[in-house]
Amino acid sequence: IHHYILEQIKTAFATEPNIAATIHGQRRIFQGCYRRRTALFPSKKCGGSIPTESRLELAHAVCLEQNPSVINYRSQALKIKLSHEQYCYPDFLIQTIDGCYEVHEVKPSVASLALDEYVRFDRIATLLHILVLMYHPFLFVPYQPFLFLTYH
């Protein structure tokens, strides 16, 4: 499973934009779905448009674009197997200037998380820690920037 994730990282950053200049991840985000706030964020760092599922993800993409320590990123780029039939698609895969990779999950608030989501975050963090990948759930707190939680 570890080799599979590392191969996905390599493939994600080798993926070229399609004819519409969009860079899709493992899980495609379709634009124009009813009651969803999807967007395409044009990114110089990525060399194409990055699809996002929400306004919060769009705001995070803007932050990544402006962060000087980030050289590249992709949305929904990893498909992580959690159990026999359960998969997880973290929101962002990030490549930093020091050659490291980070995985970010963006959620609206701590209060909105169910217990099973905390358990899922912990399982993902454990799996990615073995691969020496940083896993950061970003939880938006009103009137503050992002609450930065790091799992080591």
Where are these regions (language model features)?
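Electrostatic, structured charged patches in enzyme active sites and in nucleic-acid/phosphate-binding
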Residues: 1-152
